[in-house]
Amino acid sequence: MNNPQQPREYDAVLGGNSPSLEGAAVLGGIEGVKLRLQNPDSKVRIAALEQALNYGKQGLDLVIAGLKDESWAIQNAAYLILNSRTEPRIKQILQKPNHEGFKLQKIEVVTVNKFAEIIQRQQRVARYFIEDLGNGVKLEMAAIPGGTFMMGSPENEIGRHDKESPQHQVSVPSFFIGKYPVTQAQYQAITGTNPSYFKGSNRPVEKVSWKNAVTFCEKLSQKIGKSYRLPSEAEWEYACRARTTTPFHFGDTITTDLANYNGNYKETTEVGSFGVANNFGLYDMHGNVWEWCQDSWHSSYKGAPTDGSAWLDTEENTNLKLLRGGSWCYNPDYCRSAFRDPYNLDDLNFNIGFRVVCSGAAWT
């Protein structure tokens, strides 16, 4: 049995200047929770948020205050704690954008083993801002924190190609990218047209050339008043990997239960229909439709930029641009995080779409 006089993990101990715990008073209750919420260790603060629920409305208010914490980890923990509550007041708070203007959403992230069996499910929080395109059409943009990653594939990765070499370190500033590939409804709202072969307002737009995608970004920028563009190849892979190093953000392989590739579907599917995201809150990064990137085609990464910017100066073929992500009619190897392929900027196909990027303020 625990001795009630002994301090527990995360208890705040008040003992003046004495280095010994003997004779010190353990500050418990709601005041102890408040003190632990000032601790620089995020693990201590998260534990304090969980304990705060033991103290009624006053404790609940402390958790709500955690939504405005400077630390993303604390905001994340506070949101997940509150998301399980049923009070109308709490639900109303969670429906509103936070103090930074982001909409927080709970997402499910899964990991598979080499047999494509799900071995882990995690509840996480992603943050988005939402653009109103008119007539009820919205565009959700996910916040991607800046960071450094290894771009390309290691030599021992199954299914790799030489064009994914050499693997190299890239530092990417923070940015925003579409939660999903651009949908037909979104494309129609901005351009007034829908060229897609597989019709459906919530399916990804396809049969768009690189030039069509760039024109969409230009028109979107004019309408919204922010600068929208295609992702650089480095931004795309960084966003896809979402701090993973495996061939897919799910793990070593994928399954038709998690992605639309050359398997069961034989056409595009509605965006987000598999219900699982990567760690950054992005959907359909593997399969469904290929996605255009800004960059000109280079057959290897020799001389590639390392700052996350698009590689636009090329002497190989100025008409070739970059595709990423694979599609509904391609094998899994082509859907890997590192796979890259050239395509003529004027050509289009019923398996090629895109998603958009908006540069953002720095955070980590």
Q: What do these predicted regions represent?
A:
Residues 33, 168, 173-175, 201, ...:
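Short amphipathic alpha-helical segments
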